Each structure stands twice: as structure tokens, then as C-alpha cells.
Design a protein with these regions (language model features):
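N-terminal beta1-alpha1-beta2 module of alpha/beta enzyme domains
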Residues: 1-59, 63-66, 150
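Hydrophobic faces of well-ordered beta-strands that scaffold small-molecule active sites
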Residues: 5-9, 33-35, 63-67, 94-98, ...
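Short, acidic/polar
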Residues: 14-25, 82, 156-164, 292-302
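Conserved, mostly hydrophobic/aromatic
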Residues: 25, 29, 55, 86, ...
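Glycine-rich, proline-tolerant flexible connector loops at the mouths of alpha/beta enzymes
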Residues: 34-58, 70, 102-104, 176-180, ...
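An alpha-helical appendage that flanks or caps ligand/catalytic pockets
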Residues: 111-143, 183-184, 188-305
Length: 337
């Protein structure tokens, strides 16, 4: 099965540098490029839409979007305005991946969005993009011209969010690791939501978030990627996921230190590796795509068999471009698919 491939690129350096990098990513054959949206994370990240706009000006075909935005750190109407503008700059290549903001709302002292907030945001964006008369809360507008083809893609991990995505979104971004058993578990919930709304398969695209490392030194890859599993093991759904992967749930240590600003975005990755040393190798291997180019290609092929449409690839990093993963995918993985 042929699927699409995207790359996660963080906002490091100036927007002009990101634009040049996006041009390289496009030339390498990637279908989409999404950039995270956590404003001023650790004082180092910048505004995602500035970077995306510059990327749009230097590319011609690759689709662009925040990966992912949320209705908390930006008001939904502000997100809608930014995405419409990006769609105009890129001549129809904008996408709207969004989630609850669990990894970004905390920096402002707020909680992640509720399911009701995500439903309301989706309805607002769909109304705005369609050009329908839309009440923004204090003023009614009709978008001129409308942009009805911007896809609204909901990021989801838990059962209720996966079901909501299947019910109302144009696509679902599945964030449950890289084991086919976990993906099938997630898709069962997506399909429950689709059935509830009377939707068919073609109405909801399926994209996987896959954290990956292409390295012939398998143990080195495991050690590098170990922190990427840490947050998942503290999630309420860990028992179900690891059961689907045929693994036992490891015992969490008490009072584990938290790297700055958080485990998934640690400025000091060596510290992140130290505080997650308790995670067994087999869990790291199950939840990431890692190893040689052949091993990563075999994992990608197994995931494609789960009836998905795309993989959004990301590395472990936060503070630099994903150069090693980029080259590893292009040179060693994609030729084997």
C-alpha cells in the first residue's frame, strides 16, 4: 500500500532558514511538513506561522501546517485566520492539525482543552472555511473567498478523542506509538466514532505520528530514543497499549526528576536519558521505529498494512532540525519501501 510521508520540523533559527530547509524537504519527496506550535518554549521556539509562511514562499508542492496547534494558547478564531492566510500564501497547501494542547497549554498555566472545546473549535473552523455565516461571539462574518478544502485533522491518543476525531474531523493524527497492535487499537476507536456519525472510510484520513531513529547501531538508537516513551508510560491508556503490543507494563519509579522544560522537549537530552533509564529496551523498540534502514522500512511497511494514509515522521529532538532522520529516511528507508 502506498502511503504519504511527512516530516516534523521545529522552529529553530530564523524563519528564512526554515524556508530553505523546507525547500530541501520538498525536493527530497516528502508530501507534507508540519511544525510544532508551543509559543516561546524554553525561550527558544518562535512563532510557527511566521516559519510556515516563509516555508510556503520557498516551496511549490509540499503541504504545510502546525503540528499541532490547539484552541487554548490561541483562540480558535485566531487559528482560523492564520490558517486561511497560510492557505492563501501557499496557494492551497495549508492543513490544520490540532489537538488538546496538553503539551503546550501548561506553559501558560492552563489545562488542555476538553472534548467539548475541541468539538466547538472544529465546528467553528468548518463554518469559517466554508464561507457560511459564522458567529465569532461578537460579530458575524462570511469568509470571502471561502476555503472549504482546508483539512481539519484532530490529534488523538485516548479512546474518547479518537472516537471524536472519527466522528467530526477530516482526518485523525494517531499518537499511540509505533506498534501495529497499538495502531489497530486506535483505529477501532476511530471507526466507532465514524460509525456513530454514519461516515465511511474515505471521509477520515489516517496519519500516524512515528518517532524514529535510523542507525545501524541498534543499542545506540534504543538509548537515544528511550525518553520518547516516558510520557506514554505515564498515560492512563498505557495498560491497553502495552497489552496490544504483547508487553508488560514496567513499574514506574517514584519521584522521577523532570527535565527542563519537560521530558519530551528536554533541553538536556542526556538528562532525559538518565531519568528514563528504567524503561526496558523492548518497550522502546515497540513504541519507536528504530534501527537500520531495513528495520525502519520493515516497521513502516507493517504500519502501512494497518490501513493508514500517511506517516508523520519525527526524531527525538526539539532544538535542531531533524537532519539525521531526514537523511536516514531518504537514503536508507524510502528506497526499501
Amino acid at each position: 500500500m502506498t502511503i504519504e510521508h511527512g516530516l516534523r520540523v521545529p522552529m529553530v533559527g530564523k524563519p528564512q532558514a526554515t524556508a530553505a530547509y523546507a525547500k530541501e524537504v520538498e525536493a527530497a519527496g516528502f508530501d507534507f511538513l508540519w511544525m510544532p506550535d508551543t509559543p516561546l518554549l524554553a525561550g527558544l521556539w518562535r512563532d510557527v506561522y511566521m516559519h510556515l509562511t516563509c516555508a510556503a514562499l520557498e516551496t511549490k508542492h509540499i503541504r504545510l501546517g502546525p503540528g499541532v496547534t490547539n484552541p487554548i494558547t490561541r483562540l480558535p478564531v485566531t487559528v482560523g485566520s492564520a490558517i486561511v492566510t497560510l492557505n492563501e500564501v501557499s496557494e492551497g497547501r495549508a492543513e490544520l492539525p490540532y489537538g488538546s494542547g496538553y503539551s503546550s497549554a501548561y506553559i501558560t498555566g492552563r489545562k488542555a482543552a476538553s472534548l467539548q472545546m475541541m468539538r466547538e473549535a472544529t465546528e467553528l473552523w468548518r463554518s469559517i472555511f466554508s464561507g457560511a455565516l459564522t458567529d465569532l461571539g461578537g460579530l458575524e462574518i462570511e469568509l470571502d473567498p471561502p476555503h472549504p478544502d482546508i483539512p481539519i485533522i484532530m490529534a488523538a491518543s485516548g479512546p474518547r478523542t479518537l472516537q471524536l476525531a472519527g466522528e467530526i474531523a477530516d482526518g485523525v493524527l494517531i499518537m499511540v506509538g509505533a506498534h501495529p497492535g497499538c495502531i489497530q487499537w486506535a483505529l477501532e476507536h476511530v471507526e466507532t466514532g465514524m460509525a456513530r456519525a454514519g461516515r465511511d472510510r474515505a471521509e477520515v484520513s489516517r496519519t500516524l505520528v512515528i518517532t524514529a531513529c535510523v542507525d545501524d547501531d541498534r543499542q545506540r538508537a534504543i538509548d537515544l530514543m528511550r525518553p520518547c516513551v516516558g510520557n506514554l508510560l505515564r498515560h492512563s491508556l498505557v495498560n491497553e497499549l502495552l497489552d496490544r503490543a504483547g508487553l508488560a507494563v514496567p513499574k514506574l519509579p517514584d519521584n522521577t526528576p523532570q527535565p527542563y522544560p519537560d521530558l519530551g522537549h528536554a533541553v538536556d537530552w542526556e538528562e532525559a536519558k538518565r531519568v528514563t533509564a528504567w524503561i526496558p529496551d523492548e518497550v522502546v523498540v515497540a513504541m519507536n521505529a528504530l534501527g537500520s534502514g531495513l528495520e525502519v522500512a520493515e516497521r513502516a511497511a507493517a504500519l502501512a498494512e494497518c490501513d493508514i494514509d500517511a506517516i508523520w515522521w519525527r526524531d527525538h529532538g526539539t532544538w535542531e532540525y531533524p537532519n539525521a532522520l531526514f537523511r536516514g529516511l531518504v537514503d536508507e528507508v524510502f528506497p526499501k519501501l
